[in-house]
């Protein structure tokens, strides 16, 4: 039987509400422009250990998607900016993309969203006219695969498409983009999807020339004389983050669209910058992300939409040290490329307290590494690198098996554990790799291991090298949690509507 139009619209509205009615979550963006990118399996192990349940990928990397299989972690995949033109012009290209990058992995991998491009209007404006077509073609391909209710489609937008975001109540989208934005919003409304927004208070603060105080950008409490108030609505804004999200809601209302949920697909704060980037500090980054997590997980929306939580993805998991541009561009991550924490980051109210430190990441020899190169690396680690190699001497707990890969792994790891917080890497001329799997065995405990049954012998731990200059980051903790949704009332509403419809037939 065909459902009447009113019921179809109610169903779409309910599905849209369901998509964002869960208790708010904090996710992370995973960029890959870094040296010594950890293997996907190790990244997933790390995410699971910290109870991170939502991630955004900037493409649809097959190795990453396979690693996320059977984890329940919700994955947002990306159509790259370079792929949009072809997908927008050819429905067959969209179908092929969905079949290859989404349908092939579901249900094992929990793909729940597709981000079509990133900041398309402001970075590749010549593609803007075809963006709506690309969105529709991807959605039609999902419909054909019966995945349109599970996987939502949208396109992340920059704050730059709103020229004057303050006061939020008067914010509008740039008139030059009204046609494209209107098409986007109509698509989001029709498909029950959400508006993806990249909102960076760091840039809002640094480009405002002192108009707004730093504390406002960092979620810090302002004194009564510095309170930020919208003069038109008299709504108080305790953070620039909330004002940015509300600016998006008001901009949508200006085009007669309401209740399309905003999901912040990128936000964060750089931990280091150049001489002209004074606000990019470890202290500010730690403060921003710590307060951001608390803000998002209080499960409320911005002042104009208090009942719509702000699901948010932190930018980003790793410092992408290969990125070009200002120093800050390479320092948005909460982890260094070698896996150590940039600063302590914790989430109050979570049940996990697992440490993100040396005990969760080890450095070992690659299985296919050349033995001659391993010998060179082993000699360097135990010599100039000043690793503690006493445990791999004859008669000691880690001497057997007596082969170069085993000995090199122990030496590489000891050096790595001691020096990573000071910038030491796990490379050794391409012969080493990081892993979250503890390589300890029998009575041989690798440095950083929590294996109480193994021992590295009763000898001075610094027999062949000094203690590592580990700083406060060595025991830094990052804790993420996820509150389970309470969907029963909404599900009941849907059921009641369906029963009423049946009785009318």
UniProtKB/Swiss-Prot annotation:
Signal peptide: 1-23
Record key words, sorted: Cell membrane, Disulfide bond, Glycoprotein, Glycosidase, GPI-anchor, Hydrolase, Lipoprotein, Membrane, Plant defense, Signal
Cystine crosslinks: 363-426
Gene Ontology CC entries for this record: cytosol; plasma membrane; side of membrane
SMART domains: X8
Highest taxon of source: Eukaryota
Catalytic activity: Hydrolysis of (1->3)-beta-D-glucosidic linkages in (1->3)-beta-D-glucans
Catalytic residue list: 119 (proton donor), 266 (nucleophile)
InterPro entries: Glyco_hydro_17, Glyco_hydro_17_plant, Glycoside_hydrolase_SF, X8
Membrane topology type: Lipid-anchor; GPI-anchor
Any single biological process term in GO: defense response
Enzyme Commission number(s): 3.2.1.39
Location in the cell: Cell membrane
Similarity comment: Belongs to the glycosyl hydrolase 17 family.
Listed name of the protein: Glucan endo-1,3-beta-glucosidase 4
Lineage, highest ranks first: Eukaryota, Viridiplantae, Streptophyta, Embryophyta, Tracheophyta
